[in-house]
């Protein structure tokens, strides 16, 4: 099993994040989803809140507002309606 997975965060305007990360906490409609390498496939409605992740040992975050979350084959795609 890999130690990292690919995280992509995009809005209709731009690609905000494309990085190999070791973990992520993502706001879904009904609460936060914790993602680690090897996570099972998942499709979920994105909530509003702070998306945080660890890349190269550094904790980073941004705020997302609605959209979709997809987890598949050690790739996580967040398609957000808005983010900052």
Identify the meaning behind each predicted range.
Residues 4-84:
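Compact, glycine-rich, soluble single-domain proteins
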């Amino acid at each position: 099993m890999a130690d990292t997975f690919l995280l992509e965060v995009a809005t209709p305007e731009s690609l905000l994040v494309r990085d190999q990360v070791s973990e992520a906490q993502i706001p879904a409609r009904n609460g936060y989803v914790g993602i680690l390498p090897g996570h099972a496939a998942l499709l979920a409605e994105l909530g509003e809140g702070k998306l945080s992740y660890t890349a190269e040992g550094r904790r980073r975050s941004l705020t997302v507002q609605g959209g979709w979350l997809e987890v598949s084959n050690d790739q996580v795609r967040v398609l957000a309606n808005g983010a900052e």
